[in-house]
Amino acid sequence: VRRLVGSEMCIRDRFIGDTDLLEENNVHPDILLEGMVDEPYVLTKEGKKIRCLSNVCTHRGTIVCENATKTKNLVCGYHGRQYHIDGKMKFMPEFEDVENFPSESDNLPRIEMDQWGKMIFIINNKKCEIGELIGPMIERLSWLPIEEFKYNPELSRIYNVKANWALYCDNYLEGFHIPFVHKDLNQTLEYDEYFTEGIDNTVLQIGIGKDNENTFDLPKNHQDYGKNVAAYYFFLFPNMMFNFYPWGLSVNVVKPKSPEETQIEYFTYVWKEELMEKGAGSGLDKVELEDEEIVESVQKGIKSKAYDRGRYSPKREIGVHYFHRLIQKYY
């Protein structure tokens, strides 16, 4: 488990941002998990249609689009090959005598993608349908106005952890450590009512508040109605975390850099700014640093020859056990 790294792990579905990336421009390039998967892609928008295309020229492999822009065509800067905004080959100089040109293979390949509201996911491997992966999240939170959530780059972060990616996920997948590691967070949550379940490649954890302040105003027909839900934590296997609070959403993407180094990208989406520093969704920087400290301690400890492995708490480590089963299933 702990040695899975790079493309061996992060080859499935990936959150890459939201439709606001194409609000001013109709072309937005990026690289899928740079340093691991290293797949150049470009999002394009034609009318209301959003596509994800390979950003590699089918002629000689050059990156086609270097910057977000507004354009009618995609043009390779190496030899001038042009593509329509939908990726189809449009024009290539000095190719008049080439037989069977252009063909399907000269178009920019499409990369499968899907959306939940404004959220965009790349489907990089068909081991699991995106609908299956985010289905439990959509079902539980379909009432939330995701379209109103606004990305805030100033509140977004990148953290570097000196520990294996799986250890970081292990820690995220249980609330067992909250009373011991997160003293402030523990003051806001009812520890005995903390809920965890594994559903279809997803782990859901629900934090229940000690009072009804700073909790979700749930619809009367919702399955959690009547509970003081302070946070919904969704883990989408193998490396995405969607944390919903009354103020909005924090998306965390786990990026293994080496067997003992992990990078965590935080994407912050604000819904109700006035609730930002209240309840379970407050002090997220502090909570993250507390998690990093304990996970780095585990990384040091598991190197000991005296340590083999521990057993699972059937009550408190449901998510960790489910995560390990999914790794065995897919890898």
Residues of each region from the PLM?
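Generic secondary-structure boundary/loop-capping signal
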Residues: 1, 19, 61, 80, ...
